[in-house]
Amino acid sequence: MNIELIVQLTSLILISIAGPIIIALLFVKQGNL
């Protein structure tokens, strides 16, 4: 298996999971939620 492909897939999954969480945390800090 290609290590670079695995790294890219894991990074994409982490970004897709962490993205909405970070946005939600920013909204909570600003008090807009």
From Swiss-Prot:
The chain crosses the membrane at residues 5-25. Pfam families: PSII_Ycf12. Keywords: Chloroplast, Membrane, Photosynthesis, Photosystem II, Plastid, Thylakoid, Transmembrane, Transmembrane helix. The keyword Thylakoid applies. It is found in: Plastid, Chloroplast thylakoid membrane. It comes from the Eukaryota. GO terms for cellular component: chloroplast thylakoid membrane; photosystem II. Its main location: plastid. The keyword Thylakoid applies. A core subunit of photosystem II (PSII), probably helps stabilize the reaction center. Belongs to the Psb30/Ycf12 family. HAMAP family: PSII_Psb30_Ycf12. PSII is composed of 1 copy each of membrane proteins PsbA, PsbB, PsbC, PsbD, PsbE, PsbF, PsbH, PsbI, PsbJ, PsbK, PsbL, PsbM, PsbT, PsbY, PsbZ, Psb30/Ycf12, peripheral proteins of the oxygen-evolving complex and a large number of cofactors. It forms dimeric complexes. This is Photosystem II reaction center protein Psb30.
